[in-house]
Amino acid sequence: MSGVAGSNLFRLEEATIDELHQAIKDGRTTCLAVVRHYIDRVRAFNGVASALVTQDGAAVPEATGTVRAMAPLRFPSQTVKASDVLPHLDKYKGPPLEFGRMEPTASDPEVQQQFGMVVGIPNAGQVNALATLNIRGERSVTCRGEFDRHPSLGPLPPAAPPVCEYFRHFPDALDRAAELDSTYGRNPDFEAMPMFGVVFSFKDPFDTKDMRSTGGGDARYDIDFPARDHVLVEQLRRKGAIIFAKAVNTEYNGRAGDPGGRHKPAKVLPSTLGYQRSTWGGNPSNPYDTRRSASLGSSSGSALSVSINLVMASLGEETRASCRGPANHNAVALILPHKSMLGFDGGAIGADIYCDRSGIHARTIGDCAKILDALKDPVAGYYDPRDPFTTVPRSSVLSSGYATHAKASGAPGTLEGMRLGIIRESMVYPMGSKTEEPIVTAAEREIKDILGGRLGAALVESSDPRWQRDPDLEQMATDFRGALAKLVPVFMPDLLFRLGRDGLPVFKEFAAAIVPTEFAPGKVFGSGTMQPIDYCVALAEGRTSPPSNLDLATIQQQELANTFRFHIAQYLMRRAADWKAQGFTETLADWPALNARSKFWGDDQRAAFENWEEVSDPRNTLGGRQGVNERIMLRELLRRVDMMVILENKLDALVRLHTPWPPGLIGGAYQYDIVSNLRPESLSGPNAGLTEILIPAGYVTTVYDPVFSLSKDATRYVSAPSHTPTSIPEPGLPFSLVFRAEPGKEDVLLKIASAYESASKRRIPPPVFGPLPMQSSAASS
């Protein structure tokens, strides 16, 4: 994209917000040129990246999907034979498998999408990051084609729904870019509009009044765009941003689980690994290896679209992994503010309102911080009256703003005098396992060499029975296991009485120490002499050894709460009411209508949604574990645990490895049969709702992927470890470090994270998705 000859060429790929603004001021680019450039990249790289897995591997008829970037999607006709993915398929005796197939969508029966089993296509050259582009004629199914005719081109066709007359007056991304150029030229007020010309994608659950918004779901709304923007989208519009696209995501923010009930799937999927997938938008692929998962969380397309330069920045949502996982897998920066400094559930489809929160993806932490500042309303601040979780203490929001703290250099000694606690629990793994070894080895070296060696921070490590202590590092006086022993008896004694899936006590040493006691209705355990309350006193005072598995990983499991039933009903009610206030009718306004007018890529979700529809009580079964209560208690406990570790070790912040596992193969075997490859320890920050900042930390070129094995009874496929290495072309597969501290200490976190980013410079753009031919630089007007 070029404006003037010679050294003044502006390269849009990998550009920062400041570099974009300088190029606009210099006349080296325009907003319209930037949007056109991104559209060209979308057309080149945003196609289908997955292939169907069919029973016989036979080709399927050619099929087309919805229009994106002015051309319809085209699906591959070649399929993968299921027996090439699943060993001993001829001996399988379990429930019927849901093989891959093409079907019309519910939203638009004239277009098709992939359903059932898929795998990533090797060297696809495509990633499928964006589901909807804000381009006139394709940004809505309700008002598609000529029903979105520009007002200057005359009246709409007679068959157009009445709401389309209202809708077509919203400028699309090209219109808005041209409007910004004509109004402000080379001299916009960047203080009043700090996001001027910055092109954003949004995880689909964020409501955008000028684009289809369905949470990624294939649901046939009367009006598939909402009547109002999400409050964060509204703020970005006001600050000059270009609302460009809705990103592919795991629909309904990770599908929300199954509350149980009478509805069962007719067919099952042997794995959903790498299915960060939308029935409407399809499945994304990793830009460093398109056979692999684009994320370990549902905001896949948000980070992916940033990583391959389809947009400059994106807003995602995290329940328990949905922003950090995508940032990790795509080597981009993330700031995930504490729950809930930034609103989410007030104008979005969530999954678990007690954990859902908004996060910011960009290629640098400095840009993330600039965006965080821009999201603040000059009067209301970050408060959203539609989201009760934004009632956070005012002292937890920095009065100085955030971008000013994200400017640390990577010079030697920048972090001298600061103390960082290493969460070794994030790096431990079973003895003899190979799958974690490459990333853990690299991350251990990165922390020690860069954070400690170059930047000068004092490193203090926690302990774990599976971790061999580093003799060069200080050991925590009180670590996470010690803090849990002191705090569980006070803040969440219920944990000690928890039963596992086998119906037996999770904490066996506790059961062995106490007298026979009812752990749950009709479930009595205990073979010792202590009263449970006296055991709690002894545990808190250090008079008895804690259970060997009382650790960060074991305590994260929670009962599924019934709040998804509440939240979706509330969202649909509000959306219909907003349209009624505008004089239009939306009849998809409750659970029965949603289920009657939806399709799902997996039949397990169809059954789950029908079960959700029949949930009638906000409480879980009386006498059993209560999901809402557990979320509130666990948040309090985990925040106190972090603070005890920080205070008793005089730490400034904590650092952890996001995950020791590389991006998994799409449709492949899980690690240790852990669904979605979510390590329990990694859930601590989300369950606590604490601010976390993620920075790319490097790449590995050797991985050990688990493989499928048929269970002994031949009724299901399970994971088996592999010691066979797979070589990945340079630069390899990414991994990231995560920095964490309490609310109100984001200034410290940003200093540490920006210093590390500046010193390490680990991000490498995905090589396959570089500048387009004849577009090595970004054109001005």
Where do the model's predicted regions map?
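Acidic-enriched catalytic cores of C-N bond-cleaving enzymes acting on peptides and small amides
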Residues: I39, R43, S50, A63-Q113, ...
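Short, well-ordered alpha-helical
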Residues: S2-D222, N249-R255, R386-V397, A406, ...
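Structural helix-boundary/capping segments
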Residues: K25, V35, A44, S307-K434, ...
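Short helix-loop capping/hinge segments that flank enzyme active sites or metal/cofactor-binding pockets
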Residues: G3-N8, A124-V127, L133-A159, M195-D218, ...
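Short, surface-exposed loop/helix-turn segments at secondary-structure junctions
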Residues: H263, G627, P663-R679, D705-S719
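Short glycine/serine-rich loop/turn segments
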Residues: G120-A160, A192-D356, P385-T391, I423-E425, ...
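Loop/turn elements at helix/coil->beta-strand transitions in domains of secreted/extracellular proteins
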Residues: I17, T30-L32, F190-E191, F196-V198, ...
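Second-shell loop/turn segments in exported
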Residues: G6-S7, E19-D26, P158-R168, A219-I223, ...
